[in-house]
Amino acid sequence: MNLRFELQKLLNVCFLFASAYMFWQGLAIATNSASPIVVVLSGSMEPAFQRGDILFLWNRNTFNQVGDVVVYEVEGKQIPIVHRVLRQHNNHADKQFLLTKGDNNAGNDISLYANKKIYLNKSKEIVGTVKGYFPQLGYITIWISENKYAKFALLGMLGLSALLGGE
């Protein structure tokens, strides 16, 4: 076993993870969104978006219009919600407030908002506006998050390939 060769493999794995992290951060800066890519986790936006679709977000537009699909985060909940803008209000200070609703839901989202709010503050709660999507590719992440053994198996396979892989 050559120590120099093993250290080089470890360095390559570290470089791979650092490159992925830098790519994600660059994408976040370019889109002005902390989560520039999200996966649809429920059927609340059917038929427009199905469970497992990957959505690409953009957060550099000044105002959202009625009909735009936005992703927002509610205080106290970690899962972003993908819904359509039902109403929008602007005040004199260039702030925008949005009321949203899932296409497949009967009513609006007021019951989902934190602290009994009736509108979302775009600058504080909107993660981004959907600008594109890739159908069903997100099922991989859903499967990994819902299957506790899949996480360990995936990490194990990555570790084994890094250790056993040669040039």
From Swiss-Prot:
Q: Region C-terminal short (CTS) helix: which residues?
A: 153-164
User: Result of mutating residue 83 to A?
Assistant: Nonviable. Loss of protein stability
Where is this protein found? Endoplasmic reticulum membrane
The residues that carry sugar chains are 121
Q: Its topology with respect to the membrane?
A: Single-pass type II membrane protein
What GO cellular component entries does it have?
endoplasmic reticulum; endoplasmic reticulum membrane; signal peptidase complex
Q: Which parts of the chain does the record assign to the membrane side Lumenal?
A: 32-167
Keyword match Metal-binding: no
UniProt catalytic activity: Cleavage of hydrophobic, N-terminal signal or leader sequences from secreted and periplasmic proteins
Checking Pfam families in the record gives: Peptidase_S24
| Protease as UniProt keyword | yes
Q: What EC number is given for this enzyme?
A: 3.4.21.89
UniProt GO molecular function? peptidase activity; serine-type endopeptidase activity
Concerning PTM, the database record says: N-glycosylated.
Further remark: Present with 3150 molecules/cell in log phase SD medium.
Q: Which family does it belong to?
A: Belongs to the peptidase S26B family.
| PANTHER family linked to this entry | SIGNAL PEPTIDASE COMPLEX CATALYTIC SUBUNIT SEC11
Report the domain remarks.
Answer: The C-terminal short (CTS) helix is essential for catalytic activity. It may be accommodated as a transmembrane helix in the thinned membrane environment of the complex, similarly to the signal peptide in the complex substrates.
Q: What does this protein do?
A: Catalytic component of the signal peptidase complex (SPC) which catalyzes the cleavage of N-terminal signal sequences from nascent proteins as they are translocated into the lumen of the endoplasmic reticulum. Specifically cleaves N-terminal signal peptides that contain a hydrophobic alpha-helix (h-region) shorter than 18-20 amino acids.
Descriptive protein name: Signal peptidase complex catalytic subunit SEC11
